Amino acid sequence: MGAKDLNQRIDAKRIEQGITTLDDIQFEERLLEAARTTRVTKGGKRFSFSALVVIGDKRGYVGFGLGKAREVPLSIAKAIEDAKKKTIRVPIVNGTIPHDVVGEYGSARIIAFPARRGTGVIAGGAAKPIFELAGYTDVLTKVVGSSNHHNVVRAVFDALLKLRDIDAIAKVKGATVEDLRERYNIYAR
């Protein structure tokens, strides 16, 4: 799956959720990576900076963005603006994810499981701040393959886009919420 495909899925999710403006939401930002790149020209070296940022309100809204500029603060500001454009709402059930999910991007793969209350966010690298800023307090994850921050972030968002709450699953299956809870023994009451 490429970046275009993921961005299209994020846009579709935003439309499905009816997210148009996020001005009234207070976001917390975390800088995951700041990198300096150098372009050598006949006039000398030209430096450029890129920043990978995750934003979230710890109540279900989370997004990521990439910004590039000649100066670090400008690249971070651009990344935050990009993250606001890619913000989605994720389902939270008793502080954890509603069901097991696997996300992939490139050679990075993340497997996430719901956890009992008090477990905490067990995640490594770039995955932990995403789950924390989304508002999850208990979740178990494992990153397999590439640990590159860019790929891991996109793999996590691929997983988050696959999450469905019990009402959405019941609607698709044509069953009631109570039937699903009894049949599959899932979702805390």
UniProtKB/Swiss-Prot annotation:
Q: Which domain of life is it from?
A: Bacteria
One family from Pfam that matches here is Ribosomal_S5_C
Q: What organism is listed for this UniProt entry? A: Hydrogenobaculum sp. (strain Y04AAS1)
Q: Which Gene3D superfamilies match?
A: 3.30.160.20, 3.30.230.10
Gene Ontology MF terms in the entry: rRNA binding; structural constituent of ribosome
Q: Which UniProt keywords apply?
A: Ribonucleoprotein, Ribosomal protein, RNA-binding, rRNA-binding
Describe the family membership recorded for this protein in Swiss-Prot or TrEMBL: Belongs to the universal ribosomal protein uS5 family.
Question: GO CC annotation: what is one?
Answer: small ribosomal subunit
**Complex and partners:** Part of the 30S ribosomal subunit. Contacts proteins S4 and S8.
Name of protein? Small ribosomal subunit protein uS5
What function is annotated for this protein? With S4 and S12 plays an important role in translational accuracy. Located at the back of the 30S subunit body where it stabilizes the conformation of the head with respect to the body.
HAMAP family, A to Z: Ribosomal_uS5_B
Domain comment in the entry = The N-terminal domain interacts with the head of the 30S subunit; the C-terminal domain interacts with the body and contacts protein S4. The interaction surface between S4 and S5 is involved in control of translational fidelity.
The gene designation is: rpsE
Where is each S5 DRBM domain found?
Answer: 27-90
Keyword hit for Methyltransferase = no
* Family annotation (PROSITE patterns): RIBOSOMAL_S5, S5_DSRBD
Keyword Ribonucleoprotein set for record: yes
Q: Name one GO biological process term.
A: translation
